């Protein structure tokens, strides 16, 4: 889990737009965030397996 201070810091608008970065909306993780869903790979996998994301299903080939 991310610190509350880091989540608050990320929520502020940066002075320069290139400094902005995505953070998971659920757990606050800063890396591997899928922009389409706004959540990280860990939360995406967990919610996908539980069937909470419509249209998302596990690949099998």
From Swiss-Prot:
Coiled coil: none annotated. SUPFAM superfamilies: Glucocorticoid receptor-like (DNA-binding domain). InterPro entries: Ribosomal_uS14 (IPR001209), Ribosomal_uS14_bact (IPR023053), Ribosomal_uS14_CS (IPR018271), Ribosomal_uS14_sf (IPR043140). One of its GO terms (biological process) is translation. Zn(2+) binds at residues 24, 27, 40, 43. The keyword Endoplasmic reticulum does not apply. Its cofactor is Zn(2+). Signal peptide: none annotated. Binds 1 zinc ion per subunit. It holds the Pfam family Ribosomal_S14. Part of the 30S ribosomal subunit. Contacts proteins S3 and S10. HAMAP family: Ribosomal_uS14_2_B. Binds 16S rRNA, required for the assembly of 30S particles and may also be responsible for determining the conformation of the 16S rRNA at the A site. Belongs to the universal ribosomal protein uS14 family. Zinc-binding uS14 subfamily. This is Small ribosomal subunit protein uS14. It comes from Campylobacter jejuni subsp. jejuni serotype O:2 (strain ATCC 700819 / NCTC 11168). The gene is rpsZ.
């Amino acid at each position: 889990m991310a610190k509350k201070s880091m989540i608050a810091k990320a929520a502020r608008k940066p002075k320069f737009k290139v400094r902005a970065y995505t953070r998971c909306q659920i757990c606050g993780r800063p890396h591997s965030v899928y922009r389409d869903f706004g959540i990280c790979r860990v939360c995406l996998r967990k919610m996908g397996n539980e069937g909470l994301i419509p249209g998302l299903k596990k690949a099998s080939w």
